[in-house]
Structure formats: structure tokens, C-alpha cells
Amino acid sequence: PAWAAARFRTFMLEKVRRQDEAAFVRALRDFRVGRVWGDSARILQSRVRSNPPSTMPRLFTHNVQVDKWNMFQLSELPGEETVLHAEQSGPELQREFLTRNLLTPATLHVKPGALVMFTVNKNEPNRSEPLFVNGQIGTVQDVEPGAVVVKTKAGTVIRVERFTWRYDAQDEDSAAFSQFPLRLAWAMTIHKAQGLTLDSAFLD
């Protein structure tokens, strides 16, 4: 009865707002229904690369593939690996929800030279622009007590400290997950990449 009383209305969104290139919008519409020919196929073909740069994020369908590629790339770097563990508190089910759904892993492996992605937006009072944004890519320069030093593509060096997420921001007794807001960025799942703004990406 309550559901019926709510009198929900259904709306169909017809206009694409995120892209304004007509040919690209048409291609996306075709891909959604499995049409890959003509101009749409040519757009895809124009982006084929046999040897993408290692700094370009790769998108995979499963976490196992992502972890394997990220750890392989990390192992190729010289230097000592640092393992950073999340600090968690609160009800178990809420902790599990945060661990499962956050972009930031509970166990973060880093070393100087590692390609990483920021997983939150960080604003500072005296800055007109964010210090860093969710999806932005950078390279680890150093790991200090209490901070990971990251250099962005623009050349800005940032000391990244722990960030705390809560299951319910209004409830201090709800589960908390504290970790450096970073993840290895050589690869990620297509699911986790949704909503991010990536300069480039490689799909096999």
C-alpha cells in the first residue's frame, strides 16, 4: 500500500549530456545494442593499439585479473614494497560493506614509481580548485610515516594522508574505514571505473 501511495512516476532520459560529439554519441548508442559496423566500427578501429603505454590504465572484467596485472607491474619496479593496511571499526556487516564497495583496497601495496589513482576528492580552504580528485592519476614518490607522497601528471607533489569513510556519515557509531585514498592504477575493473573521469584507458 505504501508503495502504491507513493505514486512514483517513470521518466525516460533521451538526451545524452556527458558527450557532445554527435558521431561518438551515435557510436555509443550502436554499441549498446550490439551494432558494430559502419562509422561506429571505424571509430573503434581508429583506437586500436598493439602496444599501449604501461601507464595507461587497463580495464578488466574481474578483480582477479586486475590484481594480477597491478601486482605484476609493481613487481617490475625496483625498490622496497610497502604494505599499508586499513584501520577499521564498527559493526562487522557494515565493515564488510565498506570493504566490498570502496575503490580503496583494505590492503594497499605501494613503492616509489607505482602508478596510483586517487579515490576521493580533496578540497582545501584556500584553493579555488581541488587538491586532487577521484580518478586522477599520479606516481608514488616516497612513503613516509603517516603519508604517501604522490606526484600528479601536472607535476604537483602531494602528501596524501589517511582518509576515513563511514557507513553512515551522520552516525559516529557506524563502521569506519581509514586508509590512504589511493589504489594501484595500472588496472581496474570496468565496474569500478564507472563514474570516473579517465584521460585514457586500454581494453582488450
Name the predicted role of every residue range.
Residues 122-123, 127-204:
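Conserved helicase C-terminal RecA-like lobe
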